[in-house]
Regions:
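Basic nucleic-acid-binding interfaces
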Residues: 1-153
Length: 153
């Protein structure tokens, strides 16, 4: 933890970093090409509006990893409610076809994963950077060796 990691509000010094993971409802693989780029822009814009700093982020086809600094005046749960609520509205505005896939107008899964980041910020940032590669490798491993004429052993 360096001096650059400590921020201040009036009468408060803080260093609040979180690793957050959330996914579209039904874990659908929707983030490809222009949707991947646009959801990144939307999340960046929403974080800027709330004063949340994105240290590292990766948009995978079926989930999103973010390493963020959230000021202590904002709770993680209220930030995630805001982020998921506003981003789903903005995604529906840009990509009208999503309304038909998600009829209940709930784009994101109900929950999310959050973990506090202590002194291992760089390690978690590296993990998030490599997440897309890991997902692709995992998909390749599950697809190899399977076929209609091969046993599951």
């Amino acid at each position: 933890m360096g001096l650059n990691d400590i921020h201040s509000l009036s009468h408060t010094k803080w260093n609040c970093k979180y690793h957050i993971v959330f996914a579209p409802k039904y874990r659908r693989k929707v983030f490809y090409q222009n949707k991947k780029v646009e959801v990144g822009k939307i999340l960046r814009q929403l974080c800027d509006w709330k004063g949340v700093n994105i240290i590292e982020a990766e948009v995978c086809p079926d989930h999103i990893h973010m390493l963020v600094e959230i000021p202590p005046k904002i709770s993680v749960s209220s930030f995630m409610g805001y982020l998921k609520g506003k981003s789903s509205t903005m995604l529906y505005e840009q990509f009208g076809e999503l309304k038909y896939k998600y009829r209940s107008r709930e784009f994101w899964c109900k929950g999310y994963y959050v973990d506090t980041v202590g002194k291992n910020t760089s390690r978690i940032a590296e993990y998030i950077k490599n997440q897309l590669k890991e997902d692709e490798l995992g998909e390749q491993l599950t697809m190899t060796g399977m076929g209609p004429y091969k046993s599951k052993r």
